[in-house]
Amino acid sequence: MGKPDIYNSSANVEKSPYYKAMQHRAPNVLTAVDKKAHGMRRRILSQGLSDSSTRAFGNTIKKHIERLCQKIEGHSDPNTQWSESYDMARWFSYLTFDIMADVVFGQPYNLLGNSEYRYVVDSIEGSNIRTGVLIQAPEAYTWRLDKRLFPASIRHRNTFVKFISSLVQERLTTKPLERDDIISHLLTAKDSETGQGFTKNEVAAESSTLIVAGTDTSSTALAATLFYLTQYPNMYRRAVAEVRSSFAKSQDVKLGRALNECVFTRACIEESMRLSPPAASALWRRVQVGGQTVDGHAIQAGCNIGVCIYAIHHNELYYPDPFVFNPDRWLQNDKQAQSAFSPFSVGPRSCIGKGFAMAELMLAVATILVKFDIRRAPGDQGCIGQGHLEGEDGRRMVDEYQLHDHVTAFKQGPVLQFRRRDTVVQSEAE
């Protein structure tokens, strides 16, 4: 496997300059090519995304998850107690944006309850179309062909940049220590090795990256998890039994030992990210002077190399029956499977927010499964998000949650209905 030869810290590579397509004004931890500059950014950011920081944000995350639950249960059929149908790709995007805006900026935008700012999610998705192409085919930037090819995507980008710039500017007018948020940390933290801090442009760049990455990737993982759980009833019943035996009611779900012991639920999330990775394409690295050997092959300097995450996640050498949803593979301490698992990338460039993201995913999935019974919407709506036998190449897997790679993933569905458990218990008693 070429993955260790490309992504480990000793590889003679650096991040491809293609990622500059994602850059605005200043480099960020995702786009910085220089290893020293990246290391400095990572050390500063890691202070604000440590395990202790994640635990401190637990109540904030849970607050928004409960708001999503309140939204869902507010529109139910009085006879059946089942809710109206919800496209969870949209609602999870609103949820994760609300969480990230609160955690990063201390700002409650409440996309879950108010449509005023929901255009921001559309702007992120629309902007990523152009960016995704430029990362894979930077030739499209020659003579600014991207302006002709992606005018709508550029408009979306400008809309998002304007929004995030005003958000940062508004936040910078308040004193850093007045709020317990990540941007307060970014404004004051210093690199432990150099003593260097972030400029205001760098704070804006890192904050924007956290918002986009935290919104898109987590919402995709949540939508994929509920897709697969409702596609595989036996797995759904096992996950439900696990979390409901650990928590009597949804309000009891919180970060800590009881949630950590829900190992099958975590396995369901990990298997969902294996089958439908939120960022599925190759993470490009450029070979430096002296070359690099990859899986026994000598690669010359200047070449861009990478491993496609979707491809390695579906390689039967690491995952027998690779297109089957099998959470049990993550309960077997299979080092082969773990070595190929890359939803958060690997090595020194791996996602700095992995711990935060997994805490968020576990809180959301466990809370929803404790509070609600879940089913697919009836009719054609219930098929949204899955493949079709008559679909184009690569889209015929009925049991696979379909994603479109635009740096992160564009998705639709699953469309679900929810029923509060306490209403079922009450009607049975009557």
UniProtKB/Swiss-Prot annotation:
The EC designation for this entry is: 1.-.-.-
Please report a single Pfam family linked to this protein.
p450
> Which GO terms of the molecular function aspect are on file?
heme binding; iron ion binding; monooxygenase activity; oxidoreductase activity, acting on paired donors, with incorporation or reduction of molecular oxygen
CDD domains assigned to the protein according to its UniProt record, in alphabetical order: CYP67-like
Assigned keywords, A-Z: Heme, Iron, Metal-binding, Monooxygenase, Oxidoreductase
Q: Return the broad EC class.
A: oxidoreductase
InterPro entries from the entry?
Cyt_P450, Cyt_P450_CS, Cyt_P450_E_grp-I, Cyt_P450_sf, Cytochrome_P450_monoxygenase
Tell me the pathway. Answer: Mycotoxin biosynthesis
Q: Where is the signal peptide?
A: none
Q: List cofactor names only.
A: heme
Tell me the residue numbers annotated for binding heme: 351
Could you tell me the superkingdom of the organism this chain comes from?
A: Eukaryota
User: What is this protein for, i.e. what is its function?
Assistant: Cytochrome P450 monooxygenase; part of the gene cluster that mediates the biosynthesis of gramillins A and B, bicyclic lipopeptides that induce cell death in maize leaves but not in wheat leaves. The nonribosomal peptide synthetase GRA1 incorporates respectively a glutamic adic (Glu), a leucine (Leu), a serine (Ser), a hydroxyglutamine (HOGln), a 2-amino decanoic acid, and 2 cysteins (CysB and CysA). The biosynthesis of 2-amino decanoic acid incorporated in gramillins could be initiated by a fatty acid synthase composed of the alpha and beta subunits FGSG_00036 and FGSG_11656.
Which family is it part of?
Belongs to the cytochrome P450 family.
What name goes with this protein?
Cytochrome P450 monooxygenase FGSG_15680
Origin organism of this chain? Gibberella zeae (strain ATCC MYA-4620 / CBS 123657 / FGSC 9075 / NRRL 31084 / PH-1)
